[in-house]
Every structure is written in structure tokens, then in C-alpha cells.
Amino acid sequence: MISTLASLVKSFFGKVPKEDATPPAGDAAFAQAIALHQQGALDRAETLYAKALATEPCHFGALSMLGVLCYQTNRAQRAVELLARAVAIDPVQPGTHSNLALALNAVGRGRDAVESCDRAIAIDPACVEAYSNRGNSLWGLGRRDEALESYARALAFDPDHAQTHWNEGFLRLQLGQFDAGWPKQEWRWHLPHLAASRRPFTQPLWLGKEDVAGRTLLVHAEQGLGDTIQFCRYAKLVAALGARVVLEVQPPLKGLLANLEGVNQLVARGEPLPPFDLHTPLMSLPLALGTKLDAIPSESAYVRCDPDAILRWREKLGPSTLPRIGLVWQGTADNKSVPLAQMLGLVSPVAQFFSFQQGVSVADQALLDSHPEIRQDAAGLHNFADAPLLALMDLVISVDTSVAHLAGAMGKATWVPLPYNPDWRWLLEREDCPWYPGMRLFRQPAPEDWGCVITQVRKEITARFG
């Protein structure tokens, strides 16, 4: 449910402005800010937007586009404040209402976001961005059928609106409609922030139609580390078709995936590539191989750590009469994260607890240090060097992070607390996870309600180990 800069700028101007276009206010600082914004120089653009506002506090364009910039840089509440001021100055600009909806949705005000989109549509009944953003907001509220209707309206006005196709694809996947969802994921290459990272290979793209037997297929990772851990399982399936598989992964994963079955050669991104005949982005393999909900390749343990490394950790930890439980509470998005103070509610004498949290905030570190019963052996370990320690856990409790994927891929018993509207891969309602047989999902019954989730998980810990 992401909007690109081009879409955001387009919804403000009515079209993506050229660098030599004169902005509505004709202000020099604003004009420079827009050019820098589109070039990705966000710090410099922000400085110039602020300069324009210092000169003219009610500068509609600067308020609007600084709001967009704040949204892009994960300052959604500030974006709401700026865009709301812009709307108050000029309430008849549909793009500004639509952008405000994005920011409102990001701070959990989904109903207000829908209303903002409705105002944009009332001004311009053909506002594609507003229909698309309305779909995102409705999806976040759990009104998925209405979201699909809004996406359909957006695509009726613009059949090539890549952002809408991509978002609808995620929703279809969350609904388990894989036949419709996987093809729409290919629209990602029409999004500016992803198109720029598309690999310019001269070898043909393979999406499952050509025979790969006897040919070398380069499978190259994309997007996040968790995505790579989840989808690297497909290497084995491609190898079963007779292909020689070269897998390119992010550098932190090279050591971890060194023994992945089905891979003839593993390389880290940035290393020289061997000769190959065809290539496939890793996230396109489910489409290429026709993955269906009832036939997800779900081998229980396809990522295996070095046995010697596990032995070294076992000796370091020493014997324990208690089960070991690993904890991760902070994800990349606030709505995926459980506050540490609440996560500590799981700690009890029935088990020995270990923190596997990376990038601990100063406040969380102080709180963590006040609980010596939680071991911090994994602190300071990077590039998945803590995987052998993770292998010694009897249970891993992790929010939606790469650690959850790693534990699942290692076949560990893994419990995942999920937000009310989770990422597509966790589907809906079910407690099990078809991607990872050893995983159990604990879902929020209502937005932001981690209390019920923690209470349930604590009861299950007691039932399992108490």
C-alpha cells in the first residue's frame, strides 16, 4: 500500500512537472525544492520548502509538497499537519485531499482517510489517485470488498495505473487469490522506485513459459531480506525442472544460504556474475511456477546453519533445565511492532528468554538492561551471525521481521504477533501459516490491540512450558 513520488507529485500538480515547469506560486525556492525533490535530494528539498514557508507561511505549494516529503520520510503525523493546512488554504484541489488521505491512513485514521478521498472524488470524479488511495484506506479498515471496488474504479479511468495494480495484487494475495495476485505483482516494474532497480540484463526474462532444462538461470533477490529468506525455497523447484541455478542474494545472506538446496552457485550482489542463459527476479518465481494457496512449497527446514557454529553456541550457553525462548519486538513499521514494555509481559520463570532484536533504541536498551533475566547474547551480531544461536531456541516469538522468516525457514517453532491488517503473506483469520509449517500466528482482534495478543501468547507459553 505504497504510493510513489511520481504519483504524489502528480496528484498535486495534475501531472508530473518537468524540471523547467513554473510552480503555481512562481516562488524560486519552491521551484528549486520541487526539482530537488524529484531528484531524490530530500534534505535539500526540505530546506528549500521551509525557506519558502518562512517567507510565506501560507504558501499552498510548499505546505503540500513538504507534507508529501514528510510522508515519504516516515513522518506521517507531520505530513497530516502540513497537508491539513494546505487543504484549509485551498479546499478545491483533489490531489491535496488524496495526499492527506495517505498520511491519515499512515497514522491509523483510516475512516478520516476515506472521507478525504471522498472529498477529492467529489471535486474530481475521475481522480485516479483518490480512488486508489481510497482502496488502500478501506483495505486498512478491513473493508476489502469495498477496497477492490475502489481499485476497479481507479483502473477504469487509468488501466495502466501501476500503483493500483500492485496494491490490488497484494490484497488479492492476502485473500488467498493467488491466480489473480501473482500476475499483478509484475506491475512493480512500472513503479519509479522499483523500475530504477530493474536489472538491465540482455538475457531473456523467464516467467515459466520456456523450458529451462539444461540452461543456466540467474535468480536475483530483490526487496527485503525477509522476502529473500521466504522465496529462496523456490531454487529447489527450479532445479527440479533441470535448470542450473545461480542465486544472487543480498550480501548479509550469503553465508546463511551457502548450503541452500537446488543452488549450483551462490553469489552476493555486487560480485561478478557467471555466464547465464535466462534470469528471473526472485519475487517472480511464484508466478513462474504457478504457486497456488493449497500447494505452497512448504518444506519445514530449508535453511540450515553450520553444525559446528551451533555446537560452539551450545557450549557457550552451557546446560539449561529451562526451555529457551527468543524475542523480537520491533519491526520496520510501527504497526508491526509490539512496545517492549508490553512484550516484557511474556517473561516468566517457566523459560529462559533471549533478545534477538537488532537496532535496539536507546529507550528500549535501558528498559532491556533493567531486566537481567533476558539474555542479550545476540547483541552486536550482524549479517545473521546469530542464526546458530537461534537454532538453539525451543521457541521464537517475533513480530513480522526477517528473524520470523529465518526461524520459520529453519523449521523452528515460531509464534508471530500480527497487526489487525497484516502483510499479505500472513493471509487472513487462520492461525497457521502455509509458508512455514512450524509457525503460529497471533492476530490483533482490533487495530493497535496488542494487549489481547500478549495475553494469549503468555497463556500459550504457560500451557506449553509451564
Residue ranges of predicted features:
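Alpha-helical solenoid repeat scaffolds of the TPR/TPR-like class and their adjacent stem/linker regions
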Residues: M1-L395, D400-G466
